[in-house]
Amino acid sequence: MTYEYDYLVIGSGIAGLIYALQVSKYGKVAVVTKSSLNDCNTDHAQGGIAAAIDSLDSFEAHIEDTYQAGAGLGKRQVITEVISSGPKLIQYLIDLGTDFTRRDPNYDICLENLSLTMEGGHTRRRIAYAADSTGHQIMEALIARCRKNPDIEIYEYNIAIDLLTQHHVVQDEGFIPGISCWGAYVLDIIENRVDIFKARKTMMATGGAAQIYSPDTNPKVATGDGMAMARLAGARLANMEFVQFHPTAFWSPDGDTFLISESLRGEGAVLKLTDGSTFMEKYHPQGNLAPRDIVSRAIDSELKKRGEKFCYLDATNVPAEQLLRHFPSINNMLKTRGIDFTKEPIPVAPAAHYFCGGVLSTIEGITDIHNLFVAGEVACSGLHGANRLASNSLLEALVMAYKAGNHPSNLDEVQFPCIPEWKVIDEFNENEWVVISHNREIIGTIMQGYAGIRRSRRLLKYALSRLENIYNEINNFYQHNAVRKEVVETRNMAIIAIAVVKSALMRKESRGAHFLVDNPERDDEHYKHDTII
């Protein structure tokens, strides 16, 4: 089938749905998402959204914290633009129906009545939150608005396969030179059918790719689809080596991993070794509230010294009532695993969490490809530099999507070429399914072992060789079998894993989330610039 819309939105997190709501004022919108609407990183976001709201805070302080966390690679103009937009757009979320936690629950919700918490790398309390399920509260409000909007049509369980660009069509005279996007080929997972979604403007808001690591804190959908499709279509990727590991993922022997919010440390929880000793004071003046890259490396270093697999996050010094009020979801998840975090410490270890790099773009989401926009974690806007400041991710996604969608587009100028139907292959070789299932696991093992928190050029080169062979196997299967969701995802994971390793090999220094044992120091003279592939 062929569908035609003014706007195609791929992805249904905060960035995708904010953009859909904004552009629905100007035309018809399709939102395509490969799972349910709320199965996204946004819905899993516990901590909150950062903004200089408090009278004791300032834009200047938030800007400086962001720049320092980014290890000198953040773009000051972009940082300033995002941070200065924060309070206004949090008010926008409130107006849409987001129920943030209030200082005084007896009074109406407004900026002045928002309860604010502290997280790593921040010098002020500036994190607006909704208990420990901020992302879920935001998604509930956005989904309700989108479902009621007559100009937004939602296609759940549909995965985008490829962007519709010049390499899919025969060019006619009169088209804009360079690469243009006219939508995407999309697999209807339930009907097992590839459809054409033609669109004058396409927004990719597909999130990150932490699934290329094992363990990670992300939902299973975070397979780097948007980054991979953009790369296949000819867009540039930037700063892919900067993969942030969250310091405190729940650790268990069976690999049952989930995020333990940074806000817990903001409220007073302390990292300890298994013998009960503290250690973060040795690594950074902010101790337990140091930026994430520093805390993750510190934990990794201490665990390697001792041959241990986890440390503890001890919140027993925080009043139990405060813990249960602020962190009900974490409490429930821990209780099902037999842990009472008001009385005993939580076993934690770092896990892959967030991509600071992505598709090279402006803060308005403009990419190398005409009529293709990006917003959120899929993008590299210049905000995060080499390491993201806690709770700046939802802020970036919100600001980018709002800016990209808050002006009329010249829709009439976009002409569709003749787009061929998807080449259908009926054969599906079940006997070779191991190419997909096995290699998906192997990618995670390779990336964790050879391109994780600490890297060496020798192991990165070894990883690249292995990953290129894996990609060739997956792509061969993809080319000769009927398309399936898992095949598309695993292809995308291999593409992004290779991009991470290639970028890491290009940066012969240590900076932010990229630590190279061969070159453990920062080198501003030679490497204070983006890595672009």
Protein language model features and the residues they cover:
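Core beta-strand elements of the Rossmann-like FAD/NAD(P) dinucleotide-binding domain
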Residues: 2-5, 191-201, 368-369
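N-terminal Rossmann-like FAD-binding beta1-loop-alpha1 element of flavoenzymes
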Residues: 7-31
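Conserved redox-cofactor binding core of oxidoreductases
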Residues: 95-193, 198, 205, 249-252, ...
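Conserved N-terminal glycine-rich FAD pyrophosphate-binding loop of Rossmann-like flavoproteins
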Residues: 35-67, 71, 255-258
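Glycine- and aromatic-enriched mobile tails/lids
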Residues: 1-5, 22, 37, 44-50, ...
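Glycine-rich loop(s) and the adjacent beta-strand/alpha-helix scaffold that form part
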Residues: 201-258, 391-403
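An anion/pyrophosphate-binding glycine-rich loop and adjacent beta-alpha core
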Residues: 229, 235-340, 344, 407-413
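Short beta-strand to alpha-helix junction loop
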Residues: 74-87, 126-144, 155, 216-224, ...
